[in-house]
């Protein structure tokens, strides 16, 4: 009975495989939205105000960071929790594949969230005259919470690695 339960639990990790594949579909959706934004802005590029163009560019950078985050979570999560990726030797392989454990993935995700939040906060500040002060305050508080959380996670990781 014990062997059956252990084998069943170990095999259940494959339930995550479609979830990680779903992230690749989310990446496709993000890419479509990215190019939709570019197609939308190109006809208006010469009539746009510089600040509006910067807001669009920040939005594109934001989507790019989210896309990178999706790739990182998709591949690292799959390798850490499901199975190693069998990529043939003659194909290009991302140099961080197989080297990122769950803790380093968590720290990279936290750093990515801080970067994404920073871009979002910059977009909000560029339109600050149209945003109520209390809403600006909450954006800053939320961003600082992300920054503090990422810092604490990195610090705790450093402490645990140093003690082992």
Curated annotation (Swiss-Prot):
Domain of life: Bacteria
Segments passing through the bilayer: 15-35, 53-73, 136-156
Subcellular locations according to the entry: Cell membrane
Cellular component per GO, a single term: plasma membrane
Recorded topology in the membrane: Multi-pass membrane protein
Alphabetically ordered keywords of this record: Cell membrane, Membrane, Transmembrane, Transmembrane helix
Family recorded in the similarity comment: Belongs to the UPF0114 family.
Stated name of the protein: UPF0114 protein YqhA
Lineage, broadest ranks: Bacteria, Pseudomonadati, Pseudomonadota, Gammaproteobacteria, Enterobacterales
């Amino acid at each position: 009975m014990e062997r059956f339960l252990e084998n069943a639990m170990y095999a259940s990790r494959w339930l995550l495989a479609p979830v990680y594949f779903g992230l690749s579909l989310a990446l496709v959706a993000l890419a479509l939205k990215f190019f939709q934004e570019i197609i939308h802005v190109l006809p208006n590029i010469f009539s746009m105000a510089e600040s509006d163009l910067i807001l669009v560019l920040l939005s594109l950078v934001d989507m790019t960071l989210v896309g990178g985050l999706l790739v990182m979570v998709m591949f690292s999560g799959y390798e850490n929790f499901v199975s190693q990726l069998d990529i043939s030797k003659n194909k290009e392989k991302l140099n961080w594949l197989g080297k990122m454990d769950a803790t380093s993935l968590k720290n990279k995700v936290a750093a990515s969230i801080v970067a994404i939040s920073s871009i979002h906060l910059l977009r909000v500040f560029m339109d600050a005259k149209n945003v109520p002060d209390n809403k600006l305050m909450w954006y800053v508080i939320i961003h600082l919470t992300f920054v503090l959380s990422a810092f604490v996670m990195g610090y705790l990781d450093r402490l645990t690695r140093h003690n082992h």
